[in-house]
Amino acid sequence: MRRIWNDLTSMRLLPALFTCICLISCSQDTTTENQRSAYYWSTTWQMDSSKMNFIQKHHIKRLYVRFFDVVRDADGEIMPNATLQFETTDENMTAEEKKSKSLMPKGLEIIPVVYIVNDCFKANTKTNPIRSNKSGRKSSDETPRQLADKILNRILQMNEANDIENVKEIQIDCDWTASTQEAYFEFLHILKENAKDKKMQLSATIRLHQLSMTPPPVDRGILMMYNTGDVKQLSCQKPILDMKDVAPYIQHLGSYPLPLSAAYPLFSWRVLFREGKFIGIIHTDDDFPVLPSDSIVVRKPEMSDIMEAVRSINYQNEDINSEVILFDLNTDNIKRFKSEDYEKIFNHRSNSSSI
């Protein structure tokens, strides 16, 4: 267990890989320009020219970078998974090309993100469950603390190994529910205190259905304005973003007690259906065998959907859009729309109107 959590060889790390990360200049006029940010959600770090140009052209100053997932393995043990690899491994590239694609762009604030599968906070018959010590059950009092320690240590190790400096915040992404809330919140409370000792804040993602629940014990939240419908239903035309699904959840955003920023979707899905039944989301051509009678449908938010979401958030609580985050910085995603369309998302204040 300890060896796996501390084993960083699978990351293909390069010493002194990154240039120094510097925070946004203190001289920037934050009163007139909102924070422009994006998620980087992949298992391999590659900063090609299209991503670099997008970052520079749209003045993106903050990247939320997925570092690794946390899952239960076949034996029920909680383990890190799908750790981000920073070295480019394309054998067709020269050493110089690999280095350039591995470098972190200058002037970016990096926020490491860890996705934790909700099952990690549920009881498990094969091992001690992650469970709040308030339950009074034996053998689990320190389990949330152990998980918090392991996650923070792994983040710090990855930062150090890759020369990622000046990290001021870390983030946890988890689709927690009422049944896991107590254990998850205790874990967050411990992690927040540990991060504070390292002079870092803690943020967490907030899904729409979680808005009606007690806010998590973190410094701030990121409201996920996507995955709003049921992708498994062929009749659901807008599973990524449909404001008809969103509207009931955001009516009381003005009184939500946790500071929020909002993340908006750029991505699309290719969804496979067989005889009207959901088979899966196709990420690569080898994911599923496709029969002649199968249906492959593309689900994607249009610019009108994204702008409606931005305006709706403005109407409910304009402060949330003081930081606009795009999900995510993928080559296909950043080519979906025209440059001026992305600017419309970022320049929401000048394009907002009452709805």
Question: Whereabouts are the PLM-identified features?
Answer:
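Catalytic domains of carbohydrate-active enzymes, especially glycoside hydrolases
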Residues: 49-72, 161-163
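Chitinase-like catalytic core of GlcNAc-active glycosidases
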Residues: 31, 37, 69-71, 75-223
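Substrate-binding cleft of secreted/luminal carbohydrate-active enzymes
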Residues: 267-269, 275-355
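Substrate-binding surface in catalytic domains of secreted glycosidases
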Residues: 182, 186-274
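Short, acidic/polar
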Residues: 44-56, 144-161, 210, 305-314
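C-terminal motif of bacterial Sec signal peptides marking the signal peptidase cleavage site
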Residues: 24-25
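Conserved, mostly hydrophobic/aromatic
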Residues: 63, 172, 221, 262, ...
